[in-house]
From Swiss-Prot:
Family: Belongs to the class I-like SAM-binding methyltransferase superfamily. MenG/UbiE family.
Range of residues in the leader sequence: none
Protein name stated in the entry: Ubiquinone/menaquinone biosynthesis C-methyltransferase UbiE
Substrates-to-products reaction catalysed: a 2-demethylmenaquinol + S-adenosyl-L-methionine = a menaquinol + S-adenosyl-L-homocysteine + H(+); a 2-methoxy-6-(all-trans-polyprenyl)benzene-1,4-diol + S-adenosyl-L-methionine = a 5-methoxy-2-methyl-3-(all-trans-polyprenyl)benzene-1,4-diol + S-adenosyl-L-homocysteine + H(+)
Biological processes annotated in GO: aerobic respiration; menaquinone biosynthetic process; methylation
Function recorded in the entry: Methyltransferase required for the conversion of demethylmenaquinol (DMKH2) to menaquinol (MKH2) and the conversion of 2-polyprenyl-6-methoxy-1,4-benzoquinol (DDMQH2) to 2-polyprenyl-3-methyl-6-methoxy-1,4-benzoquinol (DMQH2).
EC code: 2.1.1.163, 2.1.1.201
GO molecular function, one term: demethylmenaquinone methyltransferase activity
Encoding gene (name): ubiE
Positions of S-adenosyl-L-methionine binding: 69, 90, 116-117
Length: 243
């Protein structure tokens, strides 16, 4: 049976999805609060930059993969307007439910769908923009997921991947202390769940760095791939186009 990683652990591929699901079932209720605490609110700026780069126009069809609590979908729905189509999706039912309810509370009505990024249930050449924010690192077969995202893009459509990445070397020691000491402490004290935030830190370290992910996107068939380092490389936004 094939092995993969769950944080720093080596696990069977079929077990990873269940373990990741357990993490997000656990954190869903406190997800927005913990994002604010862990990033000092910076996650909002990272997402705003992604929204600006997506450049969604009226009438666009947009797929928000691993959409979580709906920050991107909310913005895209307003930009695409009544003539557009924005799908808020997540593989985790708890996260999708929290996101759907949050969007409805904000007066945003957009379809919500349980969706495995490795088996996207849409036809070829359907979307103008596909986004995945802080979700790719949790996927078992990132290459398959990236190829699927490209498949559902229209020609000239763009994929945007916002994800934790490799921090600049001068900050590495401080970042390690924050990741492996402070994050689990925050998880324990504010969400009663140190383990899920230990996994968060480990999953970030196991995720491909900026150049590796750029190569993976190119190998998936995307062109003109570039990336933007945000907050000294704590996060990177990769953008690629389907031609």
């Amino acid at each position: 049976m094939s092995k993969t990683h769950f944080g720093f652990q080596s696990v069977d591929e079929q077990d990873k999805a269940q373990k990741v699901a357990g993490v997000f079932h656990s954190v869903a209720a406190n997800y927005d609060l913990m994002n604010d605490l862990m990033s000092g609110g910076l996650h909002r700026a990272w997402k705003m930059f992604t929204i600006a780069q997506a450049n969604v126009r009226p009438g666009y069809k947009v797929l928000d993969i691993a959409g979580g609590t709906g920050d991107l979908s909310k913005a895209f729905a307003k930009q695409a307007g009544e003539t557009g189509e924005v799908w808020h999706t997540d593989i985790n039912e708890s996260m999708l439910r929290v996101g759907r309810d949050r969007l409805l509370d904000k007066g945003v009505i957009t379809p919500a769908l349980l969706c495995d990024a490795e088996k996207i249930p849409f036809p070829d050449n359907y979307f103008d923009v596909v986004t995945v924010a802080f979700g790719l690192r949790n996927m078992t077969h990132k290459d398959i997921a990236l190829a699927e995202m490209r498949r559902v893009l229209k020609p000239a459509g763009r994929l945007l991947v916002l994800e934790f990445s490799k921090v600049w070397d001068p900050l590495k020691k401080v970042y390690d202390v924050y990741s492996f000491k402070v994050l689990p402490w925050l998880g324990e004290h504010f969400a009663k769940d140190a383990g899920s935030y230990q996994y968060l830190a480990e999953s970030i370290r196991m995720h491909p760095d900026q150049e590796t992910l750029k190569t993976m996107m190119e190998q998936a068939g995307l062109d003109g791939v570039k990336y933007y380092n945000l907050s000294a490389g704590v996060v990177a936004l990769h953008v690629g186009t389907k031609y």
